[in-house]
Amino acid sequence: MAIDFSKYIASVQDFPNKGIVFRDITPILQNGELYRAATHELAEYAKSRNADVIVGPEARGFIVGCPVATELGLGFVPARKPHKLPREVERASYDLEYGSNSLEMHKDAIKPGQRVVLCDDLMATAGTLRASKELIENLGGKLVGAAFYIELPDLKGREKLPDVDIYSLVKYHGA
């Protein structure tokens, strides 16, 4: 029987700013059975995409992606915020509501031709996904899918990356 994960995601009004509804996944993470079930669903998706490696953007992508990689016996590649990785890196920038940020991966993190699935907690505007896709492709890999706990379809992230196969456990329309 499929789990309705939306029952376990807390909605916090006006966080971090007024007018925002923050979707909090920590109730899932705090329950071992739910965390395992969510991980398994994302792992089944990654397996269906014939992934060779899992990428997770900092920071919650680590929490989501590492157990997926472990379940599948695959490697995990962190996409880090700037100046956190010790060796030579590839960098890609993305826009935020007020400004921009960047993600970095070690230049040898993705091997040419590797099939990559990105795992993260939430897809909103797809800025992080776009930057990660750019990094993966610049390193010679192919982004074959992206898996999220939560998707906010009204922010049109899918439309910005129509060539990326996207899977999400829960979709929240509206606020």
Swiss-Prot record:
- Statement: the UniProt record of this protein carries the keyword Isomerase: no
| Location (main, coarse) | cytoplasm
Q: Which NCBIfam families match?
A: apt, PRK02304.1-2, PRK02304.1-3, PRK02304.1-5
Instruction: State the organism named in the record.
Output: Lactobacillus acidophilus (strain ATCC 700396 / NCK56 / N2 / NCFM)
Q: Where in the cell is it found?
A: Cytoplasm
Q: Please name the GO terms of the biological process aspect recorded for this protein, alphabetically.
A: adenine salvage; AMP salvage; purine ribonucleoside salvage
Q: What keywords tag this UniProt record?
A: Cytoplasm, Glycosyltransferase, Purine salvage, Transferase
Q: Does the keyword Glycosyltransferase apply?
A: yes
**What reaction does this enzyme carry out catalytically?**
AMP + diphosphate = 5-phospho-alpha-D-ribose 1-diphosphate + adenine
> What is the name attached to this protein's record?
Adenine phosphoribosyltransferase
> Which SUPFAM superfamilies does the entry mention?
PRTase-like
Top-level taxon in the UniProt lineage: Bacteria
Q: Which terms does the record give in the GO molecular function aspect?
A: adenine binding; adenine phosphoribosyltransferase activity; AMP binding
Give the protein family. Answer: Belongs to the purine/pyrimidine phosphoribosyltransferase family.
Function field: Catalyzes a salvage reaction resulting in the formation of AMP, that is energically less costly than de novo synthesis.
* Pathway recorded for this protein: Purine metabolism; AMP biosynthesis via salvage pathway; AMP from adenine: step 1/1
Q: What is its EC number?
A: 2.4.2.7
Q: Spell out the Pfam families in the cross-references.
A: Pribosyltran
Q: Assembly and partners?
A: Homodimer.
One of the record's GO cellular component terms: cytoplasm
Q: Which CDD domains match?
A: PRTases_typeI
